[in-house]
């Protein structure tokens, strides 16, 4: 049964999840391989104390919604030393409406993973009716992906205290049907629909990150719901055109009246984001396309701090 554009309800799903564990504690997934999952591969929901280690997920990059690992309303989760290739998000933290009886997604560690995704390699959201907090992502390599690190809030859950460090990100654009336009880092908070107000995003940090891709960093809130307190430290961003797909877009989907926007690409694009710090951070240009523009572009932002920020216009 399809409830609306984004949610499927009832017993029927178009394709089966490979592994679904609900309300299970003290569980270990270790040292196995999954090939060609038809839908989400590993979906723990409402679980506590979960270790996911040394697993390989090799899904068909043309099969949409074949997510890799989807912790949903889970706590005390460690995902380490995994390799994931899939035609959707490799690792996606969720607090889904279907499992809303469980608590927040909190105390999460992701480290030592190699990831390839036609969507986002590591994402928080978009399903987020509950909160997300206390999350660390480190020592990962993301390559050939449509997006690298993504926080997309569309429901009422809040996001706070998320730290990313020591990560290499390579992005390229895929077919426009996929959400994203090759942003290595993206944070957005938009209402899903007329009856759903998006939660608040604050206290996010990025340290020692190297990004090479077809688009720059995007942070977009709204006038009613600004994104707050984001710090970039020792982050290097290089924009370089490599795919056949057009540049000059930002993808705001999904959300109320949100689509792909035609807009020149900046190294850092900030809209309705307050107290953003760019420290020891640079923007460089590789293969330049006509739609590349400024190192930094801001709209309706307050409290932006630049400390040793370098970058010329394209």
Residue ranges and their predicted role:
Residues 1-314:
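Extracellular/periplasmic carbohydrate-active domains that bind, remodel
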């Amino acid at each position: 049964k399809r409830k609306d554009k984004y949610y499927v309800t009832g017993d029927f799903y178009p394709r089966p999840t490979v592994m679904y564990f609900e309300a299970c504690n003290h569980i270990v997934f270790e040292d196995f391989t999954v090939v060609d999952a038809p839908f989400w591969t590993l979906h723990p929901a409402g679980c506590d104390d979960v270790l996911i280690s040394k697993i390989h997920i090799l899904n068909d990059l043309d099969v949409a919604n074949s997510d890799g690992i989807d912790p949903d309303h889970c706590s005390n989760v460690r995902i380490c030393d995994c390799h994931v290739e899939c035609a959707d998000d490799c690792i996606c933290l969720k607090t889904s409406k279907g499992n809303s009886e469980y608590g927040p997604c909190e105390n999460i560690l992701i480290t030592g993973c190699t990831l390839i995704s036609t969507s986002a390699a590591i994402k928080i959201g978009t399903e987020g009716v509950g909160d997300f907090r206390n999350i660390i992502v480190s020592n990962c390599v993301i390559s050939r992906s449509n997006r690298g690190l993504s926080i997309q809030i569309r429901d009422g859950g809040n996001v706070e205290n998320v730290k990313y460090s020591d990560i290499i990100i390579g992005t390229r654009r895929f077919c426009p049907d996929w959400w994203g336009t090759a942003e290595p880092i993206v944070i957005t908070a938009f209402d899903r629909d007329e009856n759903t107000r998006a939660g608040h995003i604050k206290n996010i940090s990025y340290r020692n990150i190297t990004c090479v891709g077809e688009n720059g960093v995007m942070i977009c809130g709204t006038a009613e719901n600004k994104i707050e307190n984001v710090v970039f430290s020792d982050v290097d961003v290089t924009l370089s055109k490599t795919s056949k797909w057009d540049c000059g877009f930002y993808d705001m989907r999904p959300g109320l009246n949100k689509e792909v926007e035609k807009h020149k690409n900046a190294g850092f694009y900030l809209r309705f984001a307050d107290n953003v710090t760019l420290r020891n951070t640079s923007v460089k240009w590789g293969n330049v396309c006509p739609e590349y523009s400024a190192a930094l572009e801001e709209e309706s932002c307050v409290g932006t701090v630049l400390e040793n920020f370098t970058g010329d216009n394209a």
